[in-house]
Amino acid sequence: MDFINIEKKWQEFWWKNKSFEPKDDFNLPKKYILSMLPYPSGEIHMGHVRNYTIGDALARYYRLHHYNVLHPMGFDSFGMPAENAAIKHGIHPKTWTYENIEAMQKEFEALGFSFSKNREFATSDPDYTKFEQQFFIDLWEKGLIYRKKAMLNWCPNDKTVLANEQVIDGRCWRCDTEVVQKELYQYYLKITNYAEELLKDLETLEDHWPSQVLIMQKNWIGKSSGLQFGFKIADECLKACNGIQEIEVFTTRADTIYGVTYIAIAPEHPLVEHAIKRVSQEDSKIIKAILNTTQRERALEKKGAFLGIYAIHPLTKQKIPVWVANFALANYGSGALMGVPACDERDFEFANLYHIPIKVITQSLQNLPHTKEEVLKNSGEWSDLSSSVAREQIIAYFEKENLGKRVINYRLQDWGVSRQRYWGAPIPMIHCKHCGIVPETQLPVTLPEDIVIDGEGNPLEKHASWKFAQCPKCHKDALRETDTMDTFIQSSWYFLRYTTPKNQRENQAFDQNYLKYFMPVDTYIGGIEHAILHLLYARFFTKALRDLGYLHLDEPFKQLITQGMVLKDGAKMSKSKGNVVSPKEILKKYGADAARLFILFAAPPAKELEWNDSALEGAHRFIKRLYDKANAITPTTSKPEFKGVILNEAQKLARKKVYEALKKSHEIFNKTESTYAFNTLIASCMEALNALSAQNNERILCEGYFVLLQILEPIIPHTAWELSERLFKRENFKPIAIDESALMEDFMTLGLTINGKRRAELKVNINASKEEIIVLAKKELEKYLEKASVKKEIYVPNKLVNFVIA
C-alpha cells in the first residue's frame, strides 16, 4: 500500500474540487464544527493533531449525512512570541508569523483535515483588525470600556500587563515568569455588567458542556449575597483621613457582626494614602512592601500593620482598630473586610499573629475558630438565635435603620485589555489635550512596519511618526494610544467571523444571513485550560456584541468537548522533557490515516492520551489489512442485498458485526449526551473486519466494505476515499439504512435456576416453543434434578427457566 501517494492524491483532489466548502443554501440542515484556533508557532504538536482530528471526524460524518457543514480554521496570530522571535532571530514579527502560518497550513493539509479554505484568516489580518477596532469604539461609546490607573499585574519578562485570569499561581500564563505589581493606565472591558447573565446562562449549557467547566466558570464569577454597611471613622481620627468618613465593608456573614475586633483594608485602599502618615517608620515599610507584592506572594503568609486609626462599630459603638492586611484585596468588594477571628480561619490566624483580641459569639465549646453556623451568644438581641435566622434579621435591621443594605457581590473583575507591546491590534484611541480621549475615525489603525524590537519597552512608544497624530475632532496635534489589545479579544469573536465567506467581508464584520444560519457553533473543541479565560471572554463578547446590535444570540457554543492532553512516558509532551513526538515524522513513517486512527482509538476525547508506538503500528497494520482484503471484491455501484438468502453462522455473524458498527456510528455522532467514544466505534469496525475475513462469501465481503468504508471515512479518509472510489465509485458515501434483519439473533441465551439459584445457561433457537425449552432445560440440569421432585416449572420468555423443587 503506497499510503504517501494515496494521501497526496486525495488531498490534491479535495483542494482542486473545493470539497469542504459549505453551500450557500440556508434551507439545508447545518452543522458548525469548530476546533479552537492555534497560535502560529510554525509547527503543530500532537495536541493540535488530537484536537483537529476529533473535529474533523465530526465534520466529515455530518457531510456524509447531508448536513451543510462549516468547519473552518484560522490563526490566533498576534502575541508576544512573534516579538521574542524578532529579538532572537532578527526577523520582523509579521514575516515570522505569516511564514509560520504557511508552514502550518501545509501540515494541516497533510493530515487530511477538511477545513474550509474560503473562511480562513489570521487575526492579525488588517481587515480583521478593522472591525475589532470598530467594536472597541462601539463598546467605548456604550460605556462598556473605560480607562483608569491601577496597580496591575506586570510580567517583567514579556514587559506587559496581564489580566487576573492570566496569572496562574502568581506567574505569567505564557512564560511562567513571576508577576509583580506596577501602576499604569489601563483600558477595561466591563465584563462585570454581565456577571449575572454569564452565571445564569450557564444553566442553558448544563447538558452540553462538561460539568467541570461549568463549575470553574461559576466559581470564577463568584456570586455571593450579603450585607454592605459602613464603619464610621472615629471623630479623633477624621483629620488624618482627609475627608474619608467611613469604611465600607461587605460580608456574607452578617450574623458574626458582634465578633468584629478589627477591620482589615487592602494597602491600595484610599484611606492608606492619608493615614499612613500616622504609623511608625517600620509599619510604613511593611505597608509599602505589601503594596508591591503579587496576590500569590500575599497568600503565602499573613502580614499587616496597624494604621493608627479607629472606626466605630455600628451596633456596639465600640472603637475598632483599622489594620492594613495583605489578604484584603482592593479588587474585591470595597477593599475592606471586617475581622471576626472567632468565626473565620484567616481572621483568627491574623489576630493571633498580631495579638488582636478575640470575641467569642457562639455557644460551641469546640476550639476556635467556630467556622460552622451555630447558635449565637454575646450578640445583643440576636443571642440564642441560630446563625441563619440571626443573619436575616440583622440584615433586615440594618436596612430598616438605613445602616446598610443587602447586596450581591461578584468575584469577577473587569477585564483589563491594554498590553504594552508592538505585535497586537492597536487600540484605536487618540489622546488630545483639548478634547480628551477621542476614538480614531480612519480604520483600521495599522502597525508601523519600520520598527526596532530590542526587548526594551513598547516599540510603539519610540516611533514618533506613528505616535504623533492629529485629533479627529479638533485636528490639533495629539498622541496616538500606544497600547495594543489583549490577544484574548481576537479569540473572543473569531468564530463569528468564520460564518461569512471571504468575498463578503470587506465592508462588514459578518453577513447577517450567514451569521443567523450558522450560529451558534454546534460543537466546539479545545482544552479545559481555557475554561475561565477564552471561554468566559467569548461568552461575554457574544453578549456585548448582541447588545450593540451585531448579533441575535446569547451563547456562542452549543456543545463543548474538552479533549485531554497527549502524554508520553506519563508526562505532557515538551521539549524540555525530551518526550516530544513530531507529527511530521509520524506522517512520513505511517501516514496521516494511521495517525488519525491511533489518536481516535487510543482514548475517548475527554481522557488523557498516552502515546504508544506499538499501538500506532497496530493502527497502520489495520489499514494495510483493510486495503489488502479489498482486492477480493468485484467493483459495483450498489450494496448487495440478502433478503431471503440462506446464510451460515459465519456469514450471519459478519453481517451482524457490520451493522452493529453502523448503528454504533450513528449513536456516537448523534446522541445528545454522546462522549464521542470513537475508540469503541473503531473496535466495532475491527471486529467487523475480522468477521468478514472469517467467512467466504464475496458478496457479504462487498456489502461489508460498502458499509465499513462509509463508517471509517471520518477516521481514515484517504484510505476510505481510495477504496470507495475503486470499488463503488463512492456511491457508498450516502446515508445507509441499518438492515435490522442482520441484527436479529437466531439464538438466545437463557439463565437456568433451581429455587431461584442460578445453576447454568442454555442457548436455544429463538423460535423454540416453551415445551421444547423446558425439555432442554431439564436435560441441562439433569444432575440437579434426577433425585428431586419438581413442584413447578417457570419460564420467563427470553430470560430464564426456574424449577421449584421440594
Curated annotation (Swiss-Prot):
Domain of life where this protein originates: Bacteria
Q: Per the UniProt entry, what are the Gene Ontology biological process annotations, in alphabetical order?
A: leucyl-tRNA aminoacylation
Which keywords does this chain's UniProt record carry? Answer: Aminoacyl-tRNA synthetase, ATP-binding, Cytoplasm, Ligase, Nucleotide-binding, Protein biosynthesis
| Top EC category | ligase
Q: For binding ATP, which residues are annotated in this chain's numbering? A: 575
Chain span(s) of sequence motif 'KMSKS' region: 572-576
Protein name listed in UniProt: Leucine--tRNA ligase
Tell me what organism the protein belongs to.
Helicobacter pylori (strain HPAG1)
Q: Which gene encodes it?
A: leuS
